[in-house]
């Protein structure tokens, strides 16, 4: 089988070790005689799997007491509705920072349920920066402040955690940089992430919520969208995504073996540094419009000087075992997604290809 490095933005690359372990256990998990895919979600075998996954995640992130970990379905996009439906309480407004495509979708959905105050936006310069926090126009009476820590499509990442003000809790869509760097969970009211980037396969959403934010859902909320219902049932109100949770648990164990979040963050810095160096040193053959402090460590978005070369670049990259480099249709160009599971060898292979391509076509 030819070696391929998969730079897809999601569903994305999984650690080879995790895939190999899942393969070895596919027909018989730990001598049970059953595949995880066919286990009862309430049987002792799967209860062990989901318990271990939660405990490993708590250890990796240093999740404090007083926070619930929920394994949900519906993707991060469903959270754009679930968050306001659950967290508004007796308030009627939400603060949101607009830094790109996913922020805009969160704003659009939240407007169905609440007044939305866009505290700051970088749309004026095509989302190339994070607006200076001191200039944000916050509402002291907002139910929460929502931001997207990493814009997967645009390649922009918050380099810091915003400060909490007026007791307004922070809510973060961390879908594409979850577990990629150390964060102080205690600074957040809620964090959520779709699994298909740094956690596991699609079909799973991981949510961390401070317990004092539970129980505020509007009265007419559908039962399946109520955080309190899922928290009370330990993510077992209905049948959860058993196999994605199993794979996520394997990823968490793999991540612990890599030195935890601190260890993987160092590796992620190195990988991103290699790619941005080849872009910046290409004499304009490659370029990125994202200002340097806000460049994503997960999604390196760049363009070729001559768009006519785009298809040639993608075709030749694929011939060299470098897959899924086409940028999102909303922005064009290229996107190399280098999540935790992307080995540094894959990034070095891409860097070498980019240098060779620039020499040939520059």
From Swiss-Prot:
Keywords: Amino-acid biosynthesis, Aminotransferase, Cytoplasm, Pyridoxal phosphate, Pyridoxine biosynthesis, Serine biosynthesis, Transferase. It catalyses: O-phospho-L-serine + 2-oxoglutarate = 3-phosphooxypyruvate + L-glutamate; 4-(phosphooxy)-L-threonine + 2-oxoglutarate = (R)-3-hydroxy-2-oxo-4-phosphooxybutanoate + L-glutamate. L-glutamate binds at residue 42. GO terms for biological process: L-serine biosynthetic process; pyridoxine biosynthetic process. Pyridoxal 5'-phosphate binds at residues 76-77, 102, 152, 173, 196, 238-239. Pathway: Amino-acid biosynthesis; L-serine biosynthesis; L-serine from 3-phospho-D-glycerate: step 2/3; Cofactor biosynthesis; pyridoxine 5'-phosphate biosynthesis; pyridoxine 5'-phosphate from D-erythrose 4-phosphate: step 3/5. SUPFAM superfamilies: PLP-dependent transferases. Disulfide bonds: none annotated. Its EC number is 2.6.1.52. The keyword Cell cycle does not apply. The modification N6-(pyridoxal phosphate)lysine is found at residue 197. GO terms for cellular component: cytoplasm. It comes from the Bacteria. Its cofactor is pyridoxal 5'-phosphate. GO terms for molecular function: O-phospho-L-serine:2-oxoglutarate aminotransferase activity; pyridoxal phosphate binding. InterPro entries: Aminotrans_V_dom (IPR000192), Aminotrans_V_PyrdxlP_BS (IPR020578), Pser_aminoTfrase (IPR022278), PyrdxlP-dep_Trfase (IPR015424), PyrdxlP-dep_Trfase_major (IPR015421), PyrdxlP-dep_Trfase_small (IPR015422). It is found in: Cytoplasm. Binds 1 pyridoxal phosphate per subunit. HAMAP family: SerC_aminotrans_5. Belongs to the class-V pyridoxal-phosphate-dependent aminotransferase family. SerC subfamily. Catalyzes the reversible conversion of 3-phosphohydroxypyruvate to phosphoserine and of 3-hydroxy-2-oxo-4-phosphonooxybutanoate to phosphohydroxythreonine. Homodimer. This is Phosphoserine aminotransferase. It comes from Chromobacterium violaceum (strain ATCC 12472 / DSM 30191 / JCM 1249 / CCUG 213 / NBRC 12614 / NCIMB 9131 / NCTC 9757 / MK).
